[in-house]
């Protein structure tokens, strides 16, 4: 994220007229990249739960719906929970931040100071107002520790944590949420203690934190939240990737589980890459072969999909999920051939 210029807390930004802000907003919208891949039917198998040699350090990033959120921000910003006298008279495009997973758009109301942001272990003093959920954060100022504590299990926990990761000390921001027509949520970060980067942690600490993230990811996946699960698996992988090679065998499981999430989220390219990392360490990993086959079919690479699915059936001939997926691939191939033949007849007939 581009860091805005450092201002004193509470200082208003009047560097541009409203017309220039609106122009920059439209230009900023044009730069938003949306992932529009259509998800296939979800795999009929389960996550990898046992330990075996695997993550993609990339966490699925899609910003579908960002344009709609920004339009709502533009129209609803006057409904904020604070006094309008605290609002900057003019904002720049750099004052908008799009959460990579598309869960919200942040508009900076009051810029913070410094360059540091909360990280693992940081104790943050925050004030949150206007959450639409039935049970939001506690009223008044609250202290939350990044990456630790039961607050992360709450409906609002993941959203606040993602936003805090992008904030500087003293920053106040409005969050526009998909499907939320009311006033924007407002979040203020008064202060935070210095946490630790992953390279500062002991090996045992990294492994323990990674196990917690993996367990949380599996809970979210089973609850029907592949996006949240992928975020947990990605965090666990980033912790383990800092360990000396070859790394713990849990990496293979995490990559395989991340691939399952990416398939459900309509990201077959990322899913195939996650499976590649599994198969580099364990060429006969059935679930990785199956998921890569599904991903290749979604990408239209039918020969590669067929090869992976046949490998699964060679190892496990009774694997029903692979049998069904291979049948779909065969039908898809016949339809492609029929379409090509029809096109050639029209061209040369």
Curated annotation (Swiss-Prot):
UniProt key word Oxidoreductase: no
**Phosphothreonine, modified sites:** 3
**CC annotations in GO:** cytosol; extracellular region
Segments of this protein annotated with the region Disordered: 36-55
Q: Which InterPro entries match?
A: FKBP4/5/8-like (IPR050754), TPR-like_helical_dom_sf (IPR011990), TPR_rpt (IPR019734)
Impact noted for substituting residue 291 to A = Abolishes HSP90AB1 binding
Q: Which residues form a coiled coil?
A: none
List the keywords (alphabetical): Phosphoprotein, Repeat, TPR repeat
Indicate the quaternary assembly: Forms a ternary complex with CDKN1A/p21 and HSP90AB1/Hsp90.
Q: What name does this protein carry?
A: FK506-binding protein-like
Q: What gene does this protein come from? A: FKBPL
